[in-house]
């Protein structure tokens, strides 16, 4: 049964007379406490925060003196007391509440400045189970939620970045806060505790290998408010989930303006793709536009890999995102600045390369500090009307699969390498996806078509266009391997690839008409392998 409100009007201005400060992150807390003290505010605090305030020479009352009860159980119990929560939750204009405060000696608390145990940091660093559990804050969220609920009278601050706004308000208005400010801080407080609990609940799900928990919470902290979303009429923000996976969310912007919504989406797609190619094996470059690759290649050098990737579709690469699996060097930078590019992301960047990229001040340059592990577990989420689709990350690797030769002719060693190369890329192309590859270089990419035949034909046409632009006698699809991210439901898609010049095929298999497709491959002396793993991407 719902609780009925007494509907007592909230005051606009509330004078801050007593403040409770209890923080794990002590950034600027002494400066804030100093301002509060000068305004005549009585300071209450706990543990390490109280010690820091006292050492700064400020008068502070330990919460244990308010509760008349010591901290116990290694600090697990210190603020969970009626004298604290009564002071936070009391409705100051309710006669019954005021009488209860007098009867039990409860002092009103007008301001709570609280941040939480660093559970996210401990989890990210891979702390052991007991240590991680010990860093689940109990008293902090309880006080935050109590303060936020009673924002009609209590100001709650959970983020050091909000201290300046609080100080400005207090100094401008004789130590008072407005209802609008208290309401805004309360909304942020509930968002903070929700995100905190989301990380905890997801950690438990991972620890217990619960793939589909009954409740799924996804939380994040705003990294930046964006100018707009996918289109100018859409609002957008970029949130960090706390996952320490190298990529666009954790990368350092070395130069260039703020990334747009579409830049972030494309950069993530590009970097996840190029990470499929281990840097110790060969330099690799991926060029992405609208979250689909328009060219991918390996090479003896990073610069050569870039040139080979660009050759696949230099027209579509204009205004694209370039991802590298090795440190960006000067030679590669000189090649990249020849063409208009939106974003470059690499594990690192040499000083010489930075100087070269600086010639293009609007070109965004990101250093990610490493490559994401393509085999690592994780989650992806997508909203639908009234719901949320959550699935495990597609971390299947072709190197880990048992490839089954299903045709009379087995692939040559080079064909097999090209098959694997193409199948890695197919995983990152919107379905239906068809990729032609030869000698570690994409020859043509067909993406996002409703018909697999159309994807094969588009990829072949792209290859012909590239051949003409490069002055080649024939497209690179001649003698290429072709990859399909899902099975061929009919032989027509395979025949389209064969018509383009493919001599080897890699696909998951699993169609009711697999034998028809195998027969067509045998008829044209084409080698084909089944992976047994599909890579739909929508």
UniProtKB/Swiss-Prot annotation:
Residues 8-158 form the MGS-like domain. Pathway: Purine metabolism; IMP biosynthesis via de novo pathway; 5-formamido-1-(5-phospho-D-ribosyl)imidazole-4-carboxamide from 5-amino-1-(5-phospho-D-ribosyl)imidazole-4-carboxamide (10-formyl THF route): step 1/1; Purine metabolism; IMP biosynthesis via de novo pathway; IMP from 5-formamido-1-(5-phospho-D-ribosyl)imidazole-4-carboxamide: step 1/1. It catalyses: (6R)-10-formyltetrahydrofolate + 5-amino-1-(5-phospho-beta-D-ribosyl)imidazole-4-carboxamide = 5-formamido-1-(5-phospho-D-ribosyl)imidazole-4-carboxamide + (6S)-5,6,7,8-tetrahydrofolate; IMP + H2O = 5-formamido-1-(5-phospho-D-ribosyl)imidazole-4-carboxamide. InterPro entries: AICAR_Tfase_dup_dom_sf, Cytidine_deaminase-like, MGS-like_dom, MGS-like_dom_sf, PurH-like. GO terms for biological process: 'de novo' IMP biosynthetic process. The keyword Transferase applies. One of its GO terms (cellular component) is cytosol. Gene3D superfamilies: 3.40.140.20, Methylglyoxal synthase-like domain. Coiled coil: none annotated. Keywords: Hydrolase, Multifunctional enzyme, Purine biosynthesis, Transferase. Its EC number is 2.1.2.3, 3.5.4.10. Pfam families: AICARFT_IMPCHas, MGS. GO terms for molecular function: IMP cyclohydrolase activity; phosphoribosylaminoimidazolecarboxamide formyltransferase activity. Belongs to the PurH family. The IMP cyclohydrolase activity resides in the N-terminal region. This is Bifunctional purine biosynthesis protein PurH. It comes from Agrobacterium fabrum (strain C58 / ATCC 33970) (Agrobacterium tumefaciens (strain C58)).
